[in-house]
């Protein structure tokens, strides 16, 4: 009985006792915090960046042999191409393709004068798909273009949209009319020069009549 009363009093006193949160107070440092923020030296940062980039380039080029490095510098310095560039084992692939194209074109720039229409391009691709044994030289001879132009046509997979196709067809119509007008002028000049019967005014009149007829019937 006495023990039960004592335990009840102990529980009651523990419940009624208020909870006190004791926090440990830490003294602040006597040092003052720096209020001024110092900007970094941008000049030194740029110099460090340039030095790093230069160092990386040197490391990249250091993978080449001494003879290959000299040959690569000579190739980059001018349009001349070394005869032994194929023997360079460390030459990048894009360089090999570039030199092979220059060698194939015999130093001339890639600028084909003759343009093929979109229908002709699609016809060449269709023939190549149906008859894979046909070579680029065969198509070049048939369509009177360079073999490199045929290779580029067969390699490309670009297809125009409906709007782009309409614009291409419109350009080809204008190009055809202009080409026909030039042919007519050349034929007129040749005829007048051979016969010598028409005067300058008559020649201009005939040219204008042919041009009007082409514009009406285009």
Curated annotation (Swiss-Prot):
Q: Which InterPro entries match?
A: NGRN/Rrg9 (IPR010487)
- Look up the record and report any one GO term of the cellular component aspect: nucleus
The cellular location(s) given in this protein's UniProt record come to:
Mitochondrion
Which residues are connected by disulfide bridges in this protein? none
* Coiled coil spans: none
Which keywords does this chain's UniProt record carry? Mitochondrion, Transit peptide
Tell me which domain of life the UniProt entry assigns to the organism this sequence originates from.
Answer: Eukaryota
Q: Where is the transit peptide?
A: 1-28
An example Pfam family from this entry, by short name, is Neugrin
What family is this? Belongs to the RRG9 family.
- Its job: Required for respiratory activity and maintenance and expression of the mitochondrial genome.
Q: This protein is called what?
A: Required for respiratory growth protein 9, mitochondrial
Species for this entry: Komagataella phaffii (strain GS115 / ATCC 20864) (Yeast)
Instruction: Give the taxonomic lineage as stored in the record.
Output: Eukaryota, Fungi, Dikarya, Ascomycota, Saccharomycotina
Instruction: Please state the gene responsible for encoding this protein.
Output: RRG9
């Amino acid at each position: 009985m006495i023990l039960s009363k004592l335990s009840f009093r102990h529980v009651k006193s523990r419940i009624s006792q208020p909870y006190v949160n004791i926090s440990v107070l830490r003294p602040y440092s006597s040092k003052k915090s720096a209020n001024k923020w110092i900007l970094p030296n941008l000049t030194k940062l740029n110099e460090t960046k340039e030095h790093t980039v230069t160092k990386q380039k040197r490391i990249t080029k250091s993978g080449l042999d001494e003879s290959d490095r000299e040959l690569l510098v000579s190739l980059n310095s001018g349009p001349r191409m070394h005869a032994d560039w194929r023997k360079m084992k460390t030459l990048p692939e894009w360089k090999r393709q570039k030199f092979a194209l220059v060698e194939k074109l015999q130093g001339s720039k890639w600028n084909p004068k003759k343009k093929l229409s979109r229908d002709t391009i699609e016809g060449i691709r269709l023939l190549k798909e149906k008859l894979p044994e046909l070579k680029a030289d065969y198509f070049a001879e048939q369509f009177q273009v360079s073999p490199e132009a045929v290779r580029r046509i067969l390699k490309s997979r670009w297809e125009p949209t409906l709007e782009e196709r309409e614009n291409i067809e419109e350009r080809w119509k204008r190009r055809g009319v202009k080409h026909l007008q030039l042919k007519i002028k050349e034929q007129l000049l040749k005829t007048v020069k051979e016969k010598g019967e028409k005067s300058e005014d008559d020649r201009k009149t005939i040219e204008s009549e042919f041009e009007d007829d082409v514009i009406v019937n285009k």
